């Protein structure tokens, strides 16, 4: 195989810096001078500015256009991103090479594997995004946003506004503010429900800087805490600390998950921990490597990952504590620094 077509837009951005909404890249394995980037006419000026060293192919149907270009150059075996191709798109692509002698080879996870290890520039952007998240949360707490009577949605929008005010390019995902019994829903969407004294308030959010995402969850109690809330919080905090300590280059992903999961299982709450320990973060909020009990593979040095165990008690409430960290040869670098001590606001 002497050519590879990349069509996943996040992978295109990673390889070229191009941020348009329609694009694909042809990588000439034997000669970089043969590389091409395809996009449509809307992005003629943008592609010239963002990818000045790669010759553009201006066609709306990007992948077929690049395959046709490779055929013209004499390539007979072309790789493509099978996990980025739709069934309909693949039918069009295969029809375009019928009886041509060209063989298409579906590949998965090639660029995602590269993205799993961050370089210094990527880590700097992640640090900046995490710092904005930390500062924004501190600001809304100082301003008294998290108080009885504020709705989940109002608190979420206030936090998002603060991230933008502090320089974020965007929010990493729709902010989760989950109060009371809603905090037992891992991915609750904020409603007009008002926060109340005695509520657990779970906040999961992130900022985007230069395309790179932060991810952090903190859980608080409003005004007065019950013993069961403190007990669940302390359990999740212990599991999270165990998970962070297991972040070492070469560690089996499922063993990292087990380090935290065993703490919760041993306390009798295994059935209330309903997701994996974490995931990679970068140009996407969820990317390789995934850390879960069924995960295969090992943790690479330079990976940016979350550690986010949780215990969720339906009808009562839940606690999740999440940090973003970078795996290093020594202790992992903690990028999200908001205090994790049990806090009553």
What are the residue ranges of the model-derived segments?
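Active-site neighborhoods and metal-handling regions in enzymes and metal-associated proteins
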Residues: 1-345
